[in-house]
Amino acid sequence: MEYRQLGNSGLRVSVLTMGTMTFGGKGNFAEVGNLQLDEVRKLIDIVADAGVNLIDTANVYSGGGSEELIGEAMGHKRKPGMLIATKARYPMGEGPNDRGLSRWHLIRECEASLKRLKTDVIDLYQVHQWDGLTPLEETMEALDSLVRSG
């Protein structure tokens, strides 16, 4: 497998990444796939054996179901060198603050993602899309706070 430097992060990631939008099959995501735990475990083993070292997911995929399946499949023990990337932005509830890139939403969703993934570390936490309602400074400060808190 070929690996490349991820910006200035110090991380080297495989040129292929395992996308997980098809995990869980809940809500609108049922249209693109409905992989369940046994299949997810097999896929993680296959990509890890091929040298893929980055699993990409998002809190919104199957309403958190994708992250839950990854957490169940890997348990509290990740494969050596496997990195996890997840994202936040889209609605995760009906409340007015259950969406967007506000500090409140990002920190709350990061904590929820950690629980669903059954891990204490997210290697790459990303914004899923621009949020024109939240000042960029607030978003960047929230992300910086998450990095500093570990």
Q: Where in this protein do the model-derived segments appear?
A:
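N-terminal binding-site loop/beta-alpha segment at the start of enzyme catalytic domains
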Residues: 1-82, 148
